Amino acid sequence: MEDEKFINSGDKPTLLNISDLTRQNMYYRKEIWTGEYLQLTVMSIPVGGEIGLELHNENDQFIGVEYGVASVYFGATKQGVKFIGNVKRDYVIIVPAGTWHNIINEGNVPLKIYSVYAPPHHPKGTIHKTKFDSDLSDY
């Protein structure tokens, strides 16, 4: 399924090949599906890139790694963020609401991940071509 041809089905029941969608995604972030209580996005983090230290007070997050390797950082406070471990394909990262976190691409290929937010975090239809675009947004 080509990224540009995917049509967001909103809150309708949907069947997706998450591995293909994630690996084919070339954008820093793309919203794939948003329901009332849950949202799916895919991300491509460039070599040496990162999500950036962030905190979601209102959202739990489930992040799956489909391609690449990364280091993961967690903390109860911004100043208390520490290295937790490395992840690769088939690992998941679970981030409870209120946890500071960062994911850094440590590999020599783009890091391909998907993220499930509960409740939804990004506006429906969100596409950030680069991290810079994401940083300019208010969400």
Predicted regions span which residues?
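A short, N-terminal "cap"/entry segment at the start of jelly-roll beta-barrel domains
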Residues: 1-39, 52, 85, 129-139
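A generic "binding-loop/recognition-motif" signal
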Residues: 38, 47, 58, 99-100, ...
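Short beta-strand His + acidic residue motifs that chelate non-heme Fe in jelly-roll/DSBH
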Residues: 51-53, 72-73, 95, 101-108
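A short hydrophobic beta-strand segment most commonly corresponding to one strand
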Residues: 62, 109-125
